[in-house]
Amino acid sequence: VGEKEVQFITDRYNKFKEIFPYLELWDKEALREKEPLLVYANKERTIDRPEPIVAMGTNDQYTTVDFGEMTKELVKAGQKVDPSKTTDVFFNSEVEEIEKIGSKFKLTTVNGTVYTADFVVVDAGAHSLFLAHKMGYGKHMGSLSMAGSFYITNGTYLNGKVYMVQNDKLPFAALHGDPDILENGKTRFGPTALALLVLERYKGGKSFFQCLKTMNFDGSIMKIFWDLLKDSDIRNYVFKNFLFEVPGINKGLFVKDARKIVPSLSVDDIEYAKGFGGVRPQVLNKTEKKLMLGEASITELEGIIFNMTPSPGATSCLGNAERDIKKVCAHLGKTFYEDQFLADYTDPEIA
């Protein structure tokens, strides 16, 4: 949106088109057909928005995945592949402590159940670093818990996922809108970004003290916070996103930002999506005294991996799983059949 961003997207398209041959560059007229509400300034669709606009996108690739259902299907497939082997999933089994005993790991849950393992992968969101710290690893890191909230429309406003241009200074996903496949295609706008002193949202203050420990607060963490807040872009972003959570004024402020995607959007078109969005760990590197962009893994101890995936998390989760399974197989002396993996999970035309 605007000449500067149009040039940025055009340049990025020219760099990416050879790597992603299915990408297309769409001008205002193409967008009028694909995503008309991006083009029109009024609900009657009689007036165009005044700014130049362009988008980079694709017609024939998926934009949305129900990762909950996908996980269930992957578990089922894993259990069926060799019926002679036991493949169990234990729910409501919160791990309180992990210990290395000889060449094995002992995992103790809050209800006292004990499991042993030859290899452990900890994919516990904001809790991963907490568990690593309890084992004495990852002490050079701290974690800032960032919660993301969403607003949802009362009808279908977009046909596909639409992102605004990312601000390189901000380690959070840019505001975007997409049809929510679990809400009958209603459009979901977000996320906001709010720092919270918990590791898990909607669970009360249960993880408050865990969060304080995981932050690993000292002079290095203080310097990271100070350097972030010195930047006016980041400072304004933090303050504005705090206001997005304040009842009474939040919708009006949020709509002003979301209108960059849908210019005709009004306060009456959206409502705060209660119960949507969780907490992501934003990793703080105490050695380099800066906030880390992207994900972090702790692999200091042979046989265990701690993964911390900030926003955007779903984008990279399967890639991380492929990376980790290779390490697991190497450690256990097993064979990873990459050709079969690629045949099952990639499109040969774009792999």
Where are the regions a protein language model picked out?
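Dinucleotide-binding Rossmann-like beta1-alpha1 core, especially the glycine-rich loop
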Residues: 1-43, 196-198, 202-208
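General small-molecule cofactor/ligand-binding pocket signal
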Residues: 24-26, 88-90, 271-273
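Helix-loop-beta segment of a Rossmann-like dinucleotide-binding subdomain
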Residues: 35-81, 86, 237-242, 301-309
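A short, glycine/Asx- and small/polar-enriched loop/turn
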Residues: 39-42, 99-106, 284-285
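Helical element adjacent to the flavin cofactor pocket in flavoenzyme catalytic cores
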Residues: 55-111, 115-119, 316-329
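Flavin-dependent oxidoreductases
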Residues: 98-211
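C-terminal catalytic lobe of FAD-dependent flavoproteins
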Residues: 214-337
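Active-site-proximal substrate-binding core of FAD-dependent oxidoreductases
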Residues: 330-351
